[in-house]
Swiss-Prot record:
The modification N-acetylalanine is found at A2. The modification N6,N6,N6-trimethyllysine is found at K200, K203. The modification N6-succinyllysine is found at K210, K248. It comes from the Eukaryota. It is found in: Mitochondrion matrix. The modification Phosphoserine is found at S223, S226. This is Electron transfer flavoprotein subunit beta. The recognition loop recognizes a hydrophobic patch at the surface of interacting dehydrogenases and acts as a static anchor at the interface. Residues 183-205 are annotated as: Recognition loop. Pfam families: ETF.
Length: 255
């Protein structure tokens, strides 16, 4: 049991507290000079892997991120939380903006095979695109069982029991290892990295590779046509009678 190895995917996203601004040309959102941090659901995935290691159920945790050089900051955060080493799949800025779930899933699948891991943890979704697809696609490419929206994870020999949130309740499933698990909000509360661990993380190894080294083509067949802010919500108007209501609706062209 103690020989299990876990790969945890972490994504660098605009910090959840930042007000998003759309670029003037509507090609995307403004990222220059904007605070970034680890995707909150990825933090939960890292925390769960670390807890399993603390129980001596996992031997090694590898944190991986795809994107520009700044992604190494996100990997360092995972290392400070308790991951053992990192892998940075370097993708240039312009190409990184077009990375979709399928491209990342291909990278993760190759790394999972290369590193011979038993568990692949991801956040259930990222707060920037909210796709909720990468974990499922990775499991499909690997032909591994998957436990998505996990709210509880328990290792049982060569299986992992996952309690997952579904519409109207909870579902409990058992997956034969190796398996893919995506973390939901209620799985755990991630720890804050302590200063000593932050200092230790600076000495931990981060391997830098390119997608081509894995034989992965990052070309996307999906392109963003336009990104727009939601329309501003207009203030309501109080009316005294039904007749006034009908007149107002006619005035604004609703009837």
């Amino acid at each position: 049991m103690a020989e299990l190895r876990a790969l945890v995917a972490v994504k660098r996203v605009i910090d959840f507290a930042v007000k998003i601004r759309v670029k003037p040309d509507k090609s995307g959102v403004v990222t220059d000079g904007v605070k970034h941090s680890m995707n909150p659901f990825c933090e939960i995935a890292v925390e769960e892997a670390v807890r399993l290691k603390e129980k001596k159920l996992v031997k090694e945790i590898i944190a991986v991120s795809c994107g520009p050089p700044q992604c190494q900051e996100t990997i360092r955060t995972a290392l400070a939380m308790g991951a053992d080493r990192g892998i940075h799949v370097e993708v240039p800025g312009a190409e990184a903006e077009n990375l979709g779930p399928l491209q990342v899933a291909r990278v993760l699948a190759k790394l999972a095979e290369k590193e011979k891991v038993d568990l692949l943890f991801l956040g259930k979704q990222a707060i920037d695109d909210d796709c909720n697809q990468t974990g499922q696609m990775t499991a499909g490419l690997l032909d591994w069982p998957q436990g998505t929206f996990a709210s509880q994870v328990t290792l049982e020999g060569d299986k992992v029991k996952v309690e997952r949130e579904i519409d109207g309740g909870l579902e409990t499933i058992r997956l034969k290892l190796p398996a893919v698990v995506t973390a939901d909000l209620r799985l755990n509360e991630p720890r804050y990295a302590t200063l000593p661990n932050i200092m230790k993380a600076k000495k931990k190894k981060i391997e830098v590779i390119k997608a081509g080294d894995l034989g992965v083509d990052l070309t996307s067949k999906v392109s963003v046509i336009s990104v727009e802010e939601p329309p501003q919500r207009l203030a309501g108007v109080k009316v005294e009678t039904t007749e006034d209501l009908v007149a107002k609706l006619k005035e604004v062209g609703r009837i």
